[in-house]
Amino acid sequence: VANSDDGFGTTVGLESTGIYTEQDARGFSPLKAGNLRVDGVYFDIIGTMPSRLKQSTGIRIGFAAESYPFQAPTGVVEQRLRPFPEKNGISLGANLVSYGGKIGEIDLRLRNEAGTLGLVAGFAYSDFRYGGGSRVSSYTMAARPIIRIGGIEIGPWAAKTIVSFQQPHVLTIVSGDTVPAVPEQRIYLGQDWTRTRLNNDNYGLTAKVPITARLLFRGGMNYSNGDRERYFSEFYILPPTGFVARHRVIADPPQQIDAVSGEAQLIYRFDSGKWVHRLIGGFRMRSRLTETGGSQAFDFGTVEYDKPDLEDKPTFQFGPVNSGRVRQSAFMLGYLGRLPGVGHINIGVQKARFRASNRNGTTGAVTTSRDDPWLYNATIGVNVTPAISLYFGTQRGLEDSGTAPDLATNRNEQLPPTRTTQYDGGIRWKFGGGQLVVNAFQITKPYFSYDTSNLFTRIGDVRHRGIEASLSGHFGKRLQIVAGALALQPRVSNVTPTAGQQGELPTGTPSKYVRIDSNYKTDIFGGLTLTAGLQYTGTRAVSAKPFDSLGGKQLMLPGVTTIDLGVRQQFTLGGVPMNLRAVLANVFDHTSWKVLAPNVLDIDERRRFSLTLVADL
């Protein structure tokens, strides 16, 4: 809460605030859309940047994106790397997390006396456990040396994550007009032999180089890979009526995903009177290889739903894998102007180039696609009074569409990027100690779902139209609040005949979402802080098709409200500053489902306790 500027999304370490995350902003995923920026530089990263390198993650939309060059329609995920150390030190962290999981962390900070050489590095072991009984264990190692000489800052990094033990979430597939009860907590319905093993490596560099007093170079490169040695999906398919489910497992052969990406910008700053101007010219690129296919499916027949069905490990006979290559680049030109006390302008144009090819591992046939669009962004902001500001903007981008779900015939295939358009505007009121923001937006893009042959492909268009609000600030000397709310109207249109019968609601997208986080500082123990959080997730569609038995409507999940309570205490032990944090999440143990894809359900998390102790040496 203390590190949040608004209620739209901030993550520091294991804690987050706001209604949006890198996986969900205005109903879409800005991370899957390819809108990650690391210290302001574009990267196409497999997975996510390890926490040992990250200082924070913020979702930049609306007013929070007003100074961002080349804004993106689905929003920008801004990740800040750990900065040059102010002093030498070591941080040790011990975390007890949900359902008995644990995390151990050590972070190192070193610098020389001259302030020209620094190092941030870390190691972590994590053992996460989930409400459905699955478990993930991993090791992460990361290091980032930093060189600062005469205003130049260059910071290479290397990070490696080894997932040594990962049980897949066992999914439930519904085909009728009812949703089953959530299975008993912490009963794993999967197999002992479906353990996934994978490696994730990230190597990169960022650089800021002042060329003259007005001209600055900013850029970076990154290599990222995800080496999947073993990968499984397990699910139970429920018939339209009854609770005798079909049990299936899909196994994948070893597959490789890797990406090289980067960006270079030249920024020229000059003034004219009170106006501050920035001209930006740049180039960004990526080249991504994705292997898919060769999978083997196992059908273990019908079993009683929500009871473990242990099967013997079968013999695997995988097929050849498919190989997909995406090459994308853009030349960019932008202008940012600001007149203090009056307003700002942010304009950008990009000439993008997209090329993709996919080689079928079985037939050897190669398919290709291409696009050469012009992209743009334009935002104008006006300071009506010193306390009240307005903004209006539009963006058109070429954004990624993610990958096909595990149950599709084109399982894990990289979906083609799509042209996305957004219009938005908002008002901000700054008051003593805080601010209130209200925005309205509309985003349109192609819609991907299953067709009648179970291929996950484009079947129409989707529009998200909504209003979002954020209230953040200090209310008195003790109370701090970060609150956000979203009212969304998602709609699917222009559905192709090959999609079969489709409803107007995209699956899994809630109509409303509210999150409130608060801190209240007391005088107990010299400053014990009480924390509380509330989350409300509105109704969302489970099925793509409507049912006559439901009055021609789609199968829906009801809204759910959860409450979190916690405490935070800072103290000194033996001269060592320490921070203790305890949280009881979902206090009243509400049960619910998550919708991952049409008719695909996963168990949402239930009541759980976490305890964190951090020492700064």
Listing of model-derived features with the role each one plays in the protein:
Residues 89-91, 95-170, 193-216:
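Transmembrane beta-barrel wall of Gram-negative outer-membrane proteins
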Residues 279, 507-617:
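Conserved C-terminal beta-signal and adjacent last beta-strands/turns
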Residues 146-148, 153-208, 225-257, 301-316, ...:
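Acidic/polar loop-and-plug regions of large Gram-negative outer-membrane beta-barrel proteins
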Residues 5-6, 27, 33, 37-39, ...:
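A beta-strand signature from Gram-negative outer-membrane beta-barrel systems
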Residues 164-177, 287-296, 353-355, 381-424, ...:
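Surface-exposed extracellular loop regions of Gram-negative outer-membrane beta-barrel proteins
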Residues 341-342, 440-444, 458-545, 591, ...:
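Gram-negative outer-membrane beta-barrel transporters
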Residues 199-227, 246-361, 383:
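Face-selective signature of the C-terminal outer-membrane beta-barrel domain
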Residues 208-210, 216-222, 226-234, 390-391, ...:
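Membrane-embedded beta-barrel scaffold of Gram-negative outer-membrane proteins
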